[in-house]
């Protein structure tokens, strides 16, 4: 038996390593905008990388509120600047083509403040402001010292500043706010139904789309080539299954929020799928490249599809008959998706499991108490498989203000074997361990990490379910599979109760230490007590929505059963440190601030811990931060070069130190900024080297450092934050060091009591050469184990910055003290285990540079939108030319032909022997007589006006051989009509026949 297990281990271990790579959150990929990150499943506002299709990424702050994505972009004008000449302004996003496209696709706003410190001569002055999209605004002096302008849409994003006069001291000083762009989704790119795209089978390609659904167990997409088909399905909310292979845990995919899928083909006979920022999943090799056929990607989701591939968005997602490689079959659906509380999850295992963040009247509050136990115990909590191992199907939602705590501890013993499981969290990691004991103990585990940690006083749902080798841990939307690994540590896992039988589950704590005598039954203590040090401590906080064996459990009923089984006096409501209902703060705390007990005692008041937002508690229980008053650490600004600030003694524990500072432009010699001391020795100090390296020195040789850019005008943040140790091991006491987005772990700085803080002023001349301190503070939290009743053992903060202000002899110029940009201090959205992963912090704001004329954006000339515009203009131009041609041939040319005969034609008519002038009369021509010369009428003198033939226009009617001489405007309104025979012209004019003339008669008005 054991030999077979050993033979199977290498193969199983290889498979585990492959699956493990799938379960770890990957690095965040750069995307076009914050909206694209939102479509990739990111819901927490944070600093994220964005880039164009061929540009280097820039890190900007992304804000997600109520399903709306905002992109926050800073510029060099956030620091005040006097405009002394034509200047151009750079932004966090270096690629201006990408930045302009972002502004075009979004609704952006920016505020410009113009300050006239000196009145212009003659009361006149002004400047032109040109936006990123080349919109110009003229600003003139109006008599007010300060003018504010709100720019939006195409006017947002100040790019150029052009003053009326260069090098004029009266020119204004300008500042701008951040450029905030609200993304506007394209309705043309939203698909409800089925979408197909044809791709080349033997070429490298990738295609991206986003999807949103609340239904699991459905087909996500299929790849079809000839007679072969590969199908990818969503299963059991968290899993992807390709072609019937083993399901792969990814994330909660049926949560009615957007996720992004990228299908790739970049290796022979291999196709890959990438979901959000998780590692790629290799699909089955059912489709071969040995063909010249086309691969059809067919996307069909019972929900919504968002087209985000560049081949779609560049054409505004418009398709017609000329693009047969993409086909859309939309369906009309009025169904509303289920979002949030009440939406079922893992319905194949649990009955009515859902994630609800609302307060619940059935919630229970657990406290850490030196005299009393704190947990919920449930008997018969697991089903048992044929091998004697538990099949867990347990879940609860918890919230805690502590960064360490026990969530579940389960155990089972039967004829076939025994085992234990434990789910607990410490700082930024939740871990699950599952051990089954037959001959030897075999354990599997996995962990889920969060950059925000899990002690943030917010509801977190934890689920453990499965059996055999398929046991999974889910924390909110994250999931991992427990696997057998060689480096699993069981030091923090509680032991199986030795004499307990059956299967039981502890929630929120366990019987890990002796408590006050007389409260608990001796047989219960003997049954469950483990006589070892404390490991994962009690979950200090609240629990609700407890599921055991897949069904929701009435915690009140279970707690009553627990008291009957374990208490000497079952009616003693204070025997356990457990209370119904979850305590809250009044008024409610702001977002990002924890509601906590002020002291370790059970009845202590609840307050907001303002240090979470680097603020200070007031006597009214609210949070406050004094107005930003920078202090320059220079002898030119401070009355002393060494300032010692005393700290009052306290029984509380130093939990956080923070320092906001701006660097000088140039450092001539190394400088000690601040030193933290006890009465005996220096605890730690913060130093600045000449190259901009900030060095934190702890206990002599233990140091941590990071080099900063001296040209960066932004205010930096240094934080030291205490990690609560697991159990009672002092060697586990650590502090987290943050310098902006950089993070490392250092040794304990609180071994001795902090008594004073020493601040050093350097011998510098001005603000540019000095360290500028914007804030300096300390935070304390109560000690849970010692001096519990001492009045100083409470949560409080110390404002050291305010204690520095009395030593300031003159205030620095605020325009030279740095830019406050809290996005520089943001923690990353995800925690990665890769040491090579770059620090993800916001990019520099850029600089104000000499005027640089913007060039034409060449890629726009090739975009689908510009092609459509060009085609439309071309069609209009062709129609206009066609109309001109038709007008010329049908109207203008016939008129010109009637009016333009040559003089030679007129001469031929006049000199012809057939020429015989006639006089047209006003009256009726009924009684016409014919003269001897064959003309109508006999008075030749009436025709003298027509002898000058060239002064008349002539038209010859060839059918009747009649010429009409039309007089010009300066001749009498009479005409001569000549009829010619078809015979050859001779010198002798034939006699006129006496019958009626065939020439037409024209009545002419002589007037």
Curated annotation (Swiss-Prot):
Signal peptide location: 1-26
Cytoplasmic topological domain residue ranges: 887-1007
Keyword Flavoprotein in record: no
Known tissue expression: Expressed in head and tail neurons, the ventral nerve cord, the VulF vulval cell and in the somatic gonad. Expressed in the male-specific sensory neuron HOA.
Region (Disordered) location: 980-1007
Keyword Transferase: no
Subcellular location: Cell membrane; Cell projection, Axon
Biological process, per Gene Ontology: nervous system development
Keywords: Cell membrane, Cell projection, Glycoprotein, Membrane, Neurogenesis, Signal, Transmembrane, Transmembrane helix
InterPro entries: ConA-like_dom_sf
UniProt cross-references to Gene3D superfamilies, sorted A to Z: 2.60.120.200
Transmembrane segments: 866-886
Glycosylated residues, chain numbering: 134, 168, 217, 487, 617, 756
Topology class, membrane: Single-pass type I membrane protein
Extracellular compartment spans: 27-865
Main location: membrane
One cellular-component annotation, GO: axon
Family: Belongs to the neurexin family.
Assembly with partners or alone: Interacts with casy-1; the interaction establishes synaptic connections between neurons.
Role description: Maintains the normal guidance and termination of axonal branches of VC motorneurons. By associating with cell adhesion protein casy-1, mediates axonal interactions to establish synaptic connections between the male-specific sensory neuron HOA and the AVG interneuron. Plays a role in regulating male mating behavior.
Record-given protein name: Neurexin-related protein bam-2
Organism: Caenorhabditis elegans
């Amino acid at each position: 038996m054991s030999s077979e297990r050993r033979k199977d281990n290498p193969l199983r271990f290889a498979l585990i390593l492959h699956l493990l790579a799938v379960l770890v959150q990957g690095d965040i990929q750069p995307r076009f905008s914050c909206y694209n990150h939102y479509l990739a499943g990111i819901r927490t506002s944070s600093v994220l990388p964005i880039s164009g299709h061929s540009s280097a990424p820039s890190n900007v702050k992304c804000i997600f509120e109520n399903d709306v994505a905002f992109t926050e972009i800073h510029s060099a004008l956030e620091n005040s600047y006097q405009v002394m000449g034509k200047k151009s302004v750079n932004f966090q996003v270096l690629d201006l083509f990408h930045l302009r496209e972002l502004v075009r696709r979004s609704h952006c706003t920016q505020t410009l403040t113009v300050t006239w410190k000196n009145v212009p001569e003659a009361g006149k002055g002004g400047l032109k402001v040109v936006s990123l999209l080349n919109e110009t605004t003229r600003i003139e002096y109006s008599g007010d010292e300060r003018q504010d302008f709100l720019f939006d849409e195409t006017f947002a994003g100040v790019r150029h500043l052009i003053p009326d006069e260069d090098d004029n001291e009266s020119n204004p000083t300008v500042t701008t706010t951040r450029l905030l762009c609200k993304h506007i989704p394209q309705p043309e790119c939203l698909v409800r139904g089925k979408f197909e795209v044809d791709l080349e089978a033997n070429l490298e390609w990738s295609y991206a789309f986003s999807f949103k659904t609340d239904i699991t167990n459905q087909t996500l997409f299929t790849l079809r080539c000839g007679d072969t088909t590969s199908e990818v399905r969503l299963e059991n909310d968290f899993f992807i299954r390709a072609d019937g292979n083993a399901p792969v845990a990814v994330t909660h995919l049926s949560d009615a929020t957007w996720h992004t899928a990228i299908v790739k083909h970049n290796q022979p006979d291999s196709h890959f799928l990438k979901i959000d920022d998780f590692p790629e999943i290799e699909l089955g090799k059912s489709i071969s490249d040995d063909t010249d056929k086309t691969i059809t990607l067919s996307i069909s989701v019972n929900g919504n599809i968002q087209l985000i591939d560049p081949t779609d968005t560049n054409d505004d997602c418009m398709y017609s008959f000329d693009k047969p490689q993409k086909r859309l079959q939309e369906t009309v659906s009025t169904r509303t998706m289920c979002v949030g509380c009440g939406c079922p999850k893992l319905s194949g295992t649990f009955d009515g499991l859902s994630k609800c963040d609302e307060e619940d009247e059935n919630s229970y509050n657990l406290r850490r108490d030196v005299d009393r136990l704190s947990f919920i115990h449930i008997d018969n909590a697991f089903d048992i498989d044929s091998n004697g191992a538990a099949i867990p199907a347990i879940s609860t939602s918890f919230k805690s203000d502590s960064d360490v705590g026990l969530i579940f501890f389960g155990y089972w013993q039967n004829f076939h074997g025994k085992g234990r499981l434990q789910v607990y969290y410490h700082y930024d990691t939740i871990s699950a361990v599952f051990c089954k004991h037959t001959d030897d103990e075999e354990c599997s585990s996995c962990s889920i990490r969060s950059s925000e940690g899990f002690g943030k006083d917010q509801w977190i749902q934890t689920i453990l379910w499965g059996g055999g080798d398929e046991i999974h841990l889910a924390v909110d939307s994250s999931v991992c599979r427990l696997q057998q690994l060689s480096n699993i540590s069981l030091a923090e896992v509680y032991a199986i109760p030795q004499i307990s039988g059956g299967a039981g589950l502890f929630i929120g704590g366990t019987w890990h230490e002796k408590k006050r005598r007389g409260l608990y039954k001796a047989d219960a203590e003997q049954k469950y007590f483990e006589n070892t040090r404390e490991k994962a401590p009690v979950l200090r906080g609240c629990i609700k929505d407890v599921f055991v064996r897949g069904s929701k459990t009435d915690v009140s009923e279970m707690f009553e059963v627990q008291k009957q089984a374990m208490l000497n006096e079952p009616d003693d409501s204070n025997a356990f440190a457990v209370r119904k209902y979850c305590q809250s703060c009044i008024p409610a705390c702001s977002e990002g601030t924890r509601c906590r007990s002020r002291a370790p005692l059970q009845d202590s008041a609840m307050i907001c811990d303002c240090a979470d937002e680097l603020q200070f508690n007031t006597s009214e229980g609210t949070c406050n931060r004094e107005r930003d008053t920078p202090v320059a650490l220079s002898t030119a600004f401070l009355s002393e070069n060494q300032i010692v600030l005393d700290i009052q003694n306290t029984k509380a524990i130093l939990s956080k130190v923070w320092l906001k500072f701006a660097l000088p432009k140039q450092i001539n010699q190394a400088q000690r900024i601040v030193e933290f001391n006890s009465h005996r020795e220096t605890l730690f100090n913060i130093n600045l080297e000449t190259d901009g390296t900030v060095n934190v020195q702890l206990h002599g040789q233990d140091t941590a450092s990071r080099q900063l850019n001296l040209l960066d005008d932004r205010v930096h943040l240094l934080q030291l934050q205490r990690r609560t140790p697991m159990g009672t091991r002092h060697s586990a006491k650590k502090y987290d060091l943050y310098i902006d987005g950089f993070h490392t772990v250092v040794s304990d700085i609180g071994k001795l009591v902090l008594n004073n803080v020493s601040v050093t002023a350097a011998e510098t001349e001005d603000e540019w050469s000095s360290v500028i301190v914007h804030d300096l503070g300390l935070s304390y939290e109560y000690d849970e184990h010692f001096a519990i009743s001492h009045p100083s053992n409470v949560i409080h903060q110390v404002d050291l910055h305010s204690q520095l202000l009395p030593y300031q002899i003159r205030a620095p110029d605020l325009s030279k003290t740095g830019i406050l940009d809290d996005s520089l201090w943001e923690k990353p959205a995800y925690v990665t285990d890769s040491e090579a992963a770059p620090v993800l912090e916001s990019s520099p704001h850029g600089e104000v540079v000499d005027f640089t004329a913007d060039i034409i954006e060449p890629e726009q000339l090739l975009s689908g939108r510009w092609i459509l515009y060009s085609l439309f203009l071309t069609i209009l131009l062709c129609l206009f030319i066609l109309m001109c041609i038709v007008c010329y041939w049908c109207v203008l040319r016939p008129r010109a032909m009637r009016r333009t005969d040559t003089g030679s034609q007129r001469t031929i008519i006049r000199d012809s022997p057939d020429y015989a002038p006639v006089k047209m009369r006003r009256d009726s021509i009924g009684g016409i007589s014919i003269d001897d010369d064959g003309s109508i009428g006999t008075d030749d003198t009436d025709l003298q006006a027509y002898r000058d033939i060239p002064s008349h226009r002539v038209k010859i009617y060839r059918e009747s051989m009649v010429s009409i001489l039309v007089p010009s405007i300066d001749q009498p309104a009479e005409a001569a009509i000549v009829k010619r025979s078809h015979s050859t012209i001779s010198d002798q004019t034939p006699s006129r026949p006496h019958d009626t003339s065939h020439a037409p008669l024209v009545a002419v008005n002589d007037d």
